[in-house]
Amino acid sequence: RRHIFLGRWMKHGVYPVKLLRLFRYGAARCEQRHMDEHMELSRGRSVEFEYDFVDENLNDLGWWAHKHVDYSSREAADIEDILSSSAAASGIDGQAGRKRAARQPLFWRSFAYFCYRYFLKLGFLDGREGFLWHFMQGWWYRTLVDARQFEKQKKGSANTER
């Protein structure tokens, strides 16, 4: 997938993103998640197309931010599922990396993810648009997800203290 953000192709930090898009009926299954689910090929082989498909949202930044505020509660629910013992035991999504990331300390993981994308994966080469993309999607959004988890934990501990 080729992300275009504020009119600029984000060539660094997260590119390329490979997604399963076309498959025979019954040859793939969808992950059981609230947010950001992926198709997993259960039989057959995959082939990569030579060219990318373009993901360019033409709405304004306010619309994008509002959408991600809504996404954050679903993402926080997914992380809660991953952290629960029953989900971890069942291998809810089969992705060990996602489980490891979910177990990192709140707020640290969003900072570390931003640094990984922006500095190690060279996101800074995408200019001001790249900074905004990696900051908003890699740090701000992930911090909002962590804040939702933190809020839920605080409410849970307040209920047990009563």
Residue map of PLM features:
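Catalytic-site signature of metal-activated, phosphate-bearing donor transferases
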Residues: 1-153, 159
